[in-house]
A protein has these predicted regions:
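Core SAM-dependent methyltransferase catalytic element
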Residues: 223-250
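Class I SAM-dependent methyltransferase SAM/SAH-binding core
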Residues: 68-70, 78-141
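A short glycine-rich, Lys/Arg-flanked "PGG" loop and its adjoining helix->strand segment in the class I
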Residues: 102, 165-180
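Short, glycine-/aromatic-enriched active-site segment of Class I SAM-dependent methyltransferases
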Residues: 188-207
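Hydrophobic beta-strand segment of the Class I
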Residues: 83, 152-153
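Conserved alpha-helix/loop element of class I SAM-dependent methyltransferases that forms part
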Residues: 39-82, 93-96, 100
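Short alpha-helix
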Residues: 208-223
Length: 250
């Protein structure tokens, strides 16, 4: 995509999720609209977390959850880990990660949306977690040093990026050697063309921009990862699935 094409898309994504954050802040549900990531409650949002996990969180963090999985459940988080959540939204996965890695670990959340960052910081304060840091920026240009992170997580966000190869390369850059990826995302079956994906949902709705399974595997391998796996977990549209994506930095 050219800059002429990508900037309007990025702004559409930013505006959609700013509206979602403001809805939660004003006491409404965290819906981002028909055809969005959270439109199908069976496949998106807070229902994908256990009751025990939801009990650890402020209501605003769970209501604001717009993801397609629970990356903290698949990322093999360990005491003392440094974790980075790409597109951290209202902070649900950052807060859970901070609790998992304990006081010797750190959980970073990166988001480009001021409204989501404000909501996430408020939620983290209410949850009583001190080992969190929320950063403003784009996931294509992560504002952290090389080899500084043990685990990268993300929840239904990479599909929204306008430059996915750059995201995967940045993930490899910030991870330490042997660092791990534990991502949940919408992934297309390989049989679907990009045009067919767009027929099934909008870009800001996490459908049209989704990578295929082969594209994900090949992209991660090209960025410097090994032990790459993409496992479909549930269908969110015809030929489109919530998926667990795992990899290790070479």
């Amino acid at each position: 995509m050219s800059t002429h094409t990508t900037e309007p898309l990025r702004e559409q994504v930013r505006a959609r999720y700013a509206d979602a954050a403001l809805s939660v802040t004003h006491g409404e549900r965290g819906s981002c609209g028909s055809g969005s990531c959270c439109a199908n409650e069976a496949g998106f949002g807070e229902a994908l977390y256990s009751g025990e996990e939801r009990g650890e969180l402020p209501d605003a963090a769970t209501v604001a959850s717009l993801g397609c999985g629970n990356p903290t459940a698949v990322a093999d988080l360990r005491e003392g880990d440094v974790v980075l959540d790409l597109g951290s939204g209202g902070g649900i996965d950052v807060i859970l990660s901070a609790k998992r890695v304990g006081p010797t670990g750190v959980a970073y959340g990166l988001d480009m949306t001021d409204e989501m960052l404000a909501l996430a910081r408020k939620n983290a304060q209410e949850a009583g977690v001190a080992n969190v840091h929320f950063l403003k920026g784009m996931i294509e240009q992560i504002p952290l040093p090389a080899d500084s992170v043990d685990v990268v997580i993300s929840n239904c966000v990479i599909n929204l990026s306008v430059d996915k190869p750059a995201v995967l390369i940045e993930m490899a850059r910030v991870l330490k050697p042997g660092g791990r990826v534990g991502v949940t995302d919408v992934v297309a079956e390989d049989r679907l063309t990009s045009e067919q994906r767009a027929e099934r949902g909008s870009y800001v709705g996490c459908i049209a921009g989704a990578l295929s399974k082969d594209e994900y595997v090949e992209g991660l391998q090209a960025a410097g990862f090994e032990d790459v796996s993409v496992e479909f977990t549930h269908e969110v549209a015809d030929g489109m699935h919530g998926a667990i994506v795992k990899a290790v930095k070479r």
